Amino acid sequence: RVIPNQNPIQTLTLQHGNNTNEATLAWTNSGTKTGANFILQELLASAWTTGGELFVGRGLFKFDLSAIPANATIISARLSLYSTPNPLNGNQVDANFGTNNSMFIERVVSNWNTTLNWPNQPLGDIATQISIPHTNQSTFDLIDVDVTGLTTSMVTGNNYGFKIRLQNEVFYNLRNFCSSKHANTAKRPKLVISYQ
């Protein structure tokens, strides 16, 4: 007699549309722009200029993990971010640009909401950050990045989401990804989690 697996591996695919837990942070060295944009079609990890001053962009986004039982074991978690085909920032041609656009994906370690701005932005966990190397390709999607450790911490602890930022925020460098507001639903941020 074959005994069925009482605890089979399950897969959850999350690709939210119009995610309210998502924002691009902006900072300029004059302090004139230090807020967060919650409706932008892009998630930025960038260092550029605007009006002759330095502009730095960072992205924050959170997936709803409530469907995963708190006592579940995370087998794997893969994050995909897709380069925007129609950039609204940077040189408005290349989604990836610069001589050093290497970036970090980090687990956010404190809560944030619509009062978010640059001065009160939550920190990312640098001890577990994931390093993404530089690319010379104008369009380069990040497919199935292993975020198992980060996601496990979100399920077993607090889920404050992910942060993306350049490793060196020096202009002109850019990584520009589609947000959950992008018209192409297939290019919105995606997280695929296997658990049991």
What role is predicted for each listed range?
Residues V56-R58, I68-L79:
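Extended extracellular/luminal ectodomain segments enriched in beta-structured repeat modules
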Residues F63, T73-P87, L191:
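A short beta-strand element within beta-rich, extracytoplasmic domains
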Residues A70-I75, T152-Y160:
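Short glycine/proline/serine/threonine-rich loop/turn segments at secondary-structure transition edges
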